[in-house]
């Protein structure tokens, strides 16, 4: 008799990749009374499983999703999830390796568009880490304009950018929140800068310097 933990682990594996598991699926999964086979029922669960993970990725990378478009973003996300399935108890870390995955997926010729997409993914990943990480809310902190003090804070992260990413990110987020057309937001200029990502009152802030 298979214990519950083993059965759960097996079922998760089947949802990710049912190929080669057909016989066990027929033995362990009860077919419905509507004519659906056990494989059909597992396929429904599998589709829902991946759809939910793509939704998590869209939540973590909303500006990237708007920039790439829903279809292309979903293709990248599904390919990424197949290589890096969730391993942690929280889905906050699901997109941890997504910027690196996109970097390795770049064309061999280093074009600006691909570099921009990778940097944008990196920025949104850092924003997610700062949002879910330690912060200054219980301590005295300096105003959000004093960059030297901000950089000295343990929870601050920095990123070297080849584009004015902070402006583009903020403009797209504003368009999303107000129901505007994100396609009207101009792509950022290819001007290098460094961006500090930090937190104030549980909100993530960006400061270019």
Model-derived features: positions:
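N-terminal, charged low-complexity regulatory/assembly segments
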Residues: 1-136
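Hydrophobic packing positions characteristic
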Residues: 82-209
